[in-house]
Amino acid sequence: MSLIKIDQKAYEYNLRHIAKKIGSFQRLICVFKDNAYGHGAKLLAPLAKNLGVSFVAVKSEEEAQEIEEFFENILILSHRPHGNENSRFIYALNDISQVKKYKQDIKIHLKIDTGMHRNGICVENLEHAIDLIRSSDLKLTGMFTHFASADEMDGSFFVQKENFQKAKKIVKKYFSNLLFHSHNSAALFRGKIPEDEYCRVGLVQFGYGDSNLKRVLSLYAHRLSQRILQKGQSIGYGGIFTAAKDMEVATYDLGYADGLFRYNGKGELVLGNGKVMLGKMSMDSFSCENSGEEICVFKDADIWADFFHTINYEILVKLNPNIQRVLV
């Protein structure tokens, strides 16, 4: 049975490193959306709580309910208002037209569009948005934005930072004691975080984005069968790989149905133990040189991301939630 191992010490090390950069665990918002980027939100929640994290962000109400026992504050980022919101949670207000659709007395964080143009209210429309919120029964407790290019060396990051500062000045005229957060994983190590802000950390908490961090997740598969592949014999669909000599091969219990990108047999896809995948990946299995009962498929998503010309996020979040995840 395939298995995901979560390195508890590595995760705790990363959070301590991040908290030191920010100033405290109290200013840290751990983003646990999409099953904590494939790592297992319910598995990691008690670890974060025990270190002092009290604020997390998720995608939906369903995700919030899975971990609500662990955290005092849970922000739901991608909610479509339905009028029956849970007062236990905080909801992102992504569009000003949604103000009247929320249940009364619900806590909200106002999303500001500072230049990404995906969700949120433009700074130019902020005064109008504030008027609508003040005339409603919603409880504005925070305001935030998202940087589109914090990991790229262009000027848009600084433009967005300036726009958010403008938005903060405006909203502070009408509300006090708001919680602000703008810096995401990519922005965390790119400069000083304003003293009046929290920091949302996503993939960086799992060891990506800074060389001082440690990878948390490693993916393993277990052997289904083994055989001697004789010289000239092929393996898998289409016979893409043909043995140049007699070799001992094995089939392992992980395939593209488990959320992996489908390897088509072209190029060398290096596994976590240094072996290469042989032939096309099947729905529920793959083959390689016999590596024992258990094989590490990957422990660094960057390697697979480079091979498949994508980003490490996509490699990790696609991992099937039904794969067992254990702390090691």
Swiss-Prot record:
Keywords: Isomerase, Pyridoxal phosphate. One of its GO terms (cellular component) is cytosol. The keyword Isomerase applies. Pfam families: Ala_racemase_C, Ala_racemase_N. It is an enzyme of class 5 (isomerase). Substrate binds at residues 118, 283. It catalyses: L-alanine = D-alanine. The modification N6-(pyridoxal phosphate)lysine is found at residue 33. PROSITE patterns: ALANINE_RACEMASE (PS00395). InterPro entries: Ala_racemase (IPR000821), Ala_racemase/Decarboxylase_C (IPR009006), Ala_racemase_C (IPR011079), Ala_racemase_N (IPR001608), Ala_racemase_pyridoxalP-BS (IPR020622), PLP-binding_barrel (IPR029066). Coiled coil: none annotated. GO terms for biological process: D-alanine biosynthetic process; peptidoglycan biosynthetic process. Its cofactor is pyridoxal 5'-phosphate. Its EC number is 5.1.1.1. Pathway: Amino-acid biosynthesis; D-alanine biosynthesis; D-alanine from L-alanine: step 1/1. One of its GO terms (molecular function) is pyridoxal phosphate binding. The active site is at 33 (proton acceptor), 237 (proton acceptor). Catalyzes the interconversion of L-alanine and D-alanine. May also act on other amino acids. Belongs to the alanine racemase family. NCBIfam families: alr (TIGR00492), PRK00053.2-2 (NF000791). This is Alanine racemase. It comes from Campylobacter jejuni subsp. jejuni serotype O:6 (strain 81116 / NCTC 11828). The gene is alr.
